[in-house]
Amino acid sequence: RLLRSLMNVRFPGPALNGYMELQDELLTEEAQEKGLVKVEELPTAAEEFGIGQVRNADRMSLWRGDITRLQADAIVNAANSQLLGCFVPCHGCIDNAIHSAAGIQLRNACAELMEEQGHEEPTGKAKITPGYNLPAAHVIHTVGPIVGLKVTEKQKEELKSCYVSCLKLAEKEGLKNIVFCCISTGEFHFPNKLAAEIAVDTADRFLTGSKLERVVFNVFKEEDYNIYKKLFKKALL
């Protein structure tokens, strides 16, 4: 926890000689202890729940657990507009978990992207970096909408744009699979059920005509698992 806290508060920049090797060794060991989960070995939603309204359920999966265990071509990080990860020590957000498991190289890579861009990351776009010490080869970063008292139509479109941007980027990079976290539902307060509906519908439409082989929806809470499960089990009218 001490190392994670120090990583979380550390600003981007070069590390002391020997640090990277020690950090990488420790994070690799931690990843092995947590246990790796291969995306291609996950059952499809069609196998688990049958084929209902989701046409491409045979190319989607639902998995509950720690996203930093997944061996995938890319996992999606629900980032903030600075794109530098969470600076709160040991915070429970997905941004913190992914940066902590990847190592300080991820923040450094994001800082380079942001310096090159010259402004904050807009909502609904996507950027890609290596995964560094994660089992995932890449991290795709996207900034979801922040909801106030009520979800607006603009925010619904922005969330949809997050998914489309990530899917397009994955396809452009020649990736075969992508793992989505629940974008905007945590710290950004997007209603869970509506967010899941947008996620599944957007991915389903995109997969028709796409070369992507698998889209995985990763959830951590039982509430979210049940929401996605109901969407996949929803029968055709």
In which residue ranges do the predicted regions lie?
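Macrodomain-like recognition of ADP-ribose-binding/processing modules
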Residues: 1-237
